[in-house]
Each structure stands twice: as structure tokens, then as C-alpha cells.
């Protein structure tokens, strides 16, 4: 009897094992068939099937994933190689078209009154800034959210902010002067991150994070920005690139974003295990506290506009935006976008230019000569930004710095939701993400000879008008950078 029992148990174990193997095999075969079918559809029956480009890129997003995540942001250079092989229009993944033709730039990045324009939802997945104007997909909602911000960043708005910016610039000068002769090594990326962060902090919350008074200029902030840029690609590509898992993750939001994860972790614990997050956490709390206080103050629109130190969020709260658009959580995400974009890009460009000024004596001497008259009464009087705008060599240095430091190197996909885009003989279906990269336009050797060299003189005198055509550090159209002034 005991032997019969053992045989029965052995048979049952074998049956269960075979059953497990059988189920696994069925799942594996099913996934293989699904993936193969999806690849065949993308290669031969997809609306973009006829567009030039590598077949592997058309079949799967794993190709882009490899270059952007595994090889850490190299896809922008791989796309350049594709253009050399396949021409100005290419399909770089199953869903997206990239064009390298500066004459077509204004057809992709159009003004709001030309046609409706949306962003590609995948480009905001996982980043955690949903609800901000930058990450708003819908054309009309984006315009509503952006409209109250525009006067603040107009030329008139910048005039109002000028005294505050001068105040911060004087503080920066005082700090560096105080360190002169100390023998300390000062990292300019930390210095300019602190300066830009304090300026944008006052714009957003009327109270700066006070990084410039930090002994090391808040070096953890600069390090955090570097990490954020490096870590963005994995979260954008977090949803698997092909197959059944991709469909499931898109329908169930299986990959939570960083923002959601961070809000699930107690702040004290987060800062103990990840000190670099302190900078963003402090700014987020400053922004939330200020937004709550601004709502309580309930200032009139006239009072807000008269006060040169009013924050951008006082403008939003007193605008005609509905209450649903002025929720504290949404506005705090708007603050984080302004802080991130306003700090990182500004600091990088300033550091980039400063390096070339310090390492090229002839540039430094020429700039000093040009500044001598407008700085004659310093420190009692500083030149206005309108006076600085009239200095040709300074402006040439700024344009060259923006050309090579980049706001965003990679393409910024835009969608025409209603009508197809026509490029030469190609009709790009409505709803297709289409992008162009500043990197491609800014390094075109036919337009910018020796494109990777910092040559401010190329912008002086009578220069090739194509340089202005190709110069797009702030993008263009209805979704261009607010801070371009």
C-alpha cells in the first residue's frame, strides 16, 4: 500500500512539472508569435512602413533603447549616421519620423494659429511633470496653461525682474571676490547652478533657495541636475519596447514614474538614503508653501502687476485660469519644470562660455575692451540688459555659447493631430510624431564651418543668413522655450 502511495505521489509530481513546463512553453510560443507578428506588421503594413531607415529600428524600440539607455544617450549620434545613409527623412523607431532639413523646421514647429500641435505622450511618460504646461499634450489646454506665463517672461516682464537679477549678480560677484586669494578650487558648474537656481527660485517663490551663500555653492544641486539628465532616458524608455509586455504595460501603467515613487517614500527617509534629492525637495517645499500663501493672500491682479517682486504663480493665480488649473499640486509641478529648465540650461551655457573666455586670452581681452565703457561706473551702477544687448561681441559670444551648449540636443517630437505633414514626396500621416534635432542643425558644417569650435567671430559683420535659420536653441513655434528672452 505504501509503495502504491509513493508511485501516485511521484506521478502527480511529474504531471505537475510537465504541466508547468507546458504552460511556460505555451506562453513562450505565444509571445514569440505575437512579437513576430508585430514586427511583420510594423515592417510591411504600418502607415510608416515605406519610410527610409534601418529595418530593425522600424521593427522594435529595443534598438533605440540600446543606444539611449545601455549606451547612455548615444541615439542622437546614431540618428546622424542614419541621415548620412538614408537621407533627410528617416523612421527611427516603429512610431516616429525624424527630419534633418532646416528649411522644414518651421513646418514642424509651428505657431499656434497655424495649426494644432501636440506632443508625443511617450515623451512625458515617467518623468513626473504631468500637468505642467510643457508636458500638456492637448493643443488647446497647453495654450490655456501657457498663456498666463507669457507676460511674465516677455521683454516687459524681464524689465521688471532686472533689479532682482542685478541683486543676485552682485551677490555672486561678492562671493567670488571674497574667495579670491583663498587657494580654494571653485567649480564653475556649481557656481552657475547656484546663481541660476537662486534667480529662478525668486521667480517661482519670491524666496531663493539661497544656494549662493552655501560654502560650496550647493554642489549637491548641480550633481542632482546631472543625475536627472542621465536618468531621464531610462524612464522615458521604461515601458518595454516591443511585444505583449509593451501592450500590457501601456494599458495598466505597469511602470510607475519617479515622481509617484518619490511621493510614496517618507521625506526624512528619502533624504537619509539619497541626500542628492535634498535640493529638489527643498525647492518643491518652497514652491508649495509659496503657492498656498499666495492663494491665502488673494491679492488683486493690479497689486500683483505693480509689485516687481511678484512671483510667476501670483500672476497665474490672479489670471483668468479656472480654479481646477490653479490646484497646488499642478502648480508645484509647473514650478519644478521652471526650476529644472531655468537652472540646468542657464548654468550649462554660462559655464560653457566662461570656460572659453578663461582659456582664450584674445577673447577675454576683446570682451573686456567692449565692456569697459558700460562698466565704467561699476560697482555704483550696472549696465541694463538693453545696454548689454547692444554689445556685438558679447552677443556673438552668447549666440555661439547657445549654439554649442544646447538646451536640448535630441529631437523634440511634435504631432499634427488633424492633418498630414507633407515633406517633398512624403506624406506623413496625421498623428505621427515628427521631430528635428538642434544638434543636427547646430553642427551643419556647410552652415557653420568648423562646427565644433567656439568661434564668436562667425556672428559678426555680414555673416551667412543660414546661421540664423539653423539656430534653434529655444526651439520655435507655440511650444518654444518661455525663457528665451
From Swiss-Prot:
What CDD domains is this protein classified in?
CYP58-like
PROSITE patterns linked to this entry: CYTOCHROME_P450 (PS00086)
Q: Which Pfam families match?
A: p450
Which GO molecular function annotations are given, in alphabetical order? heme binding; iron ion binding; monooxygenase activity; oxidoreductase activity, acting on paired donors, with incorporation or reduction of molecular oxygen
Compartmental location = Membrane
| Transmembrane parts of this sequence | 20-40
Task: Give the GO biological process terms.
Answer: terpenoid biosynthetic process
Q: What class of enzyme is it?
A: oxidoreductase
Please list the residues that bind heme.
481
User: What does a knockout show?
Assistant: Leads to the accumulation of talarodiene.
Under Gene3D superfamilies, the record lists: Cytochrome P450 (1.10.630.10)
Q: Which residues form a coiled coil?
A: none
| The entry's keywords | Heme, Iron, Membrane, Metal-binding, Monooxygenase, Oxidoreductase, Transmembrane, Transmembrane helix
How does it sit in the bilayer? Single-pass membrane protein
Q: Which family does it belong to?
A: Belongs to the cytochrome P450 family.
Q: Report what the protein is called.
A: Cytochrome P450 monooxygenase tndB
Report the gene name. tndB
